[in-house]
Amino acid sequence: MRAVVQRVARGSVTVEGSVRGEVERGLVVLLGVGRGDTDDDAGYLADKVANMRIFEDGQGKMNLSVLDVKGSVLAVSQFTLYGDCRKGRRPGFSGAAPPEEARRLFELFVKELEKYGLKVATGVFREHMTVEIINDGPVTLLLDSKKNF
């Protein structure tokens, strides 16, 4: 399971002209589910996202988590994080999990975040979405539950 985590001042996701999820100060998480990912991968990434200290404290040091700053999370499914661009000019997506399994694990990831007491907004699975991200910093991190990066 892979995630692009961005610290944001604001974020929203719109589907067919309607805002479906939005957050103020917090994180936008673009989440990709890969073939072979399990419940453990969802739990691992939820723990990382909830507890990563990427917000600045009073001294300007990244020392606070989204929990500490009482922020929220906008989680957006994104199978393209498993795009393989090593051959040719069009990415292949064979590394992405099948849609049914990806949906189940995405929803589990959201539930795991909510267990921490976080407010979590989401996009709409398997829909074309317009995602607005107002970065803060900018701070953008890559996470992989298999620890590939």
Curated annotation (Swiss-Prot):
Pfam families xrefs: Tyr_Deacylase
Disulfide bonds: none
Name of this chain's protein: D-aminoacyl-tRNA deacylase
Catalytic activity: glycyl-tRNA(Ala) + H2O = tRNA(Ala) + glycine + H(+); a D-aminoacyl-tRNA + H2O = a tRNA + a D-alpha-amino acid + H(+)
Described function: An aminoacyl-tRNA editing enzyme that deacylates mischarged D-aminoacyl-tRNAs. Also deacylates mischarged glycyl-tRNA(Ala), protecting cells against glycine mischarging by AlaRS. Acts via tRNA-based rather than protein-based catalysis; rejects L-amino acids rather than detecting D-amino acids in the active site. By recycling D-aminoacyl-tRNA to D-amino acids and free tRNA molecules, this enzyme counteracts the toxicity associated with the formation of D-aminoacyl-tRNA entities in vivo and helps enforce protein L-homochirality.
Organism from which the protein derives: Pelotomaculum thermopropionicum (strain DSM 13744 / JCM 10971 / SI)
Molecular function in Gene Ontology: D-tyrosyl-tRNA(Tyr) deacylase activity; Gly-tRNA(Ala) deacylase activity; Ser(Gly)-tRNA(Ala) hydrolase activity; tRNA binding
GO cellular component assignments: cytoplasm
Domain comment as written in the entry: A Gly-cisPro motif from one monomer fits into the active site of the other monomer to allow specific chiral rejection of L-amino acids.
